[in-house]
Amino acid sequence: MKLVTSKILLTTTLAMASFSAFALKDDTNQPINIVSDNQSLDMENSVVTFTDNVVITQGSILIKANKVVITRPPENSGKKETVEAFGTPVTFHQLLDDGKPMDGKANKVHYDLGAEFLTLTGNAELRQLDSKINGERITYDVKKQQLKANGGKSRVKTVLIPSQLQQKGKK
């Protein structure tokens, strides 16, 4: 029982690392706090589910969702945890190392810790100050630091504020 509980706690910790891809370096050293109206743990399948008014904080990171599911694969599978968050929408806020805020939202957020790959699906948006990108699907490869956006049946919309881009170059 203790071993399984420890594994789930480790999974939760790793899950928070997923949202730390953009965050302050110090955020990953901060305590992870998860508050929800309900929580369930499936020890046999190594799945922990948080539902209703889920709020996750770690340092400058703030995530709000209707539901968060963290799945840990079998020990010898060679795979790592996945995190899925669902909401209307899921929102997240964090500060970057340069002190600027990064905000995002989507109906579904999926993070594969093994691949270090983040997918925002359904009315996805990433915003930094007044610059933003909107699409049906936005993916971010953390290792390669590559972002891609797809508009689905619509087009991807990007708004860049030149003065904010110039300020970034000065820092």
Where are these regions (language model features)?
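Mature-chain termini and adjacent capping regions
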Residues: M1-K171
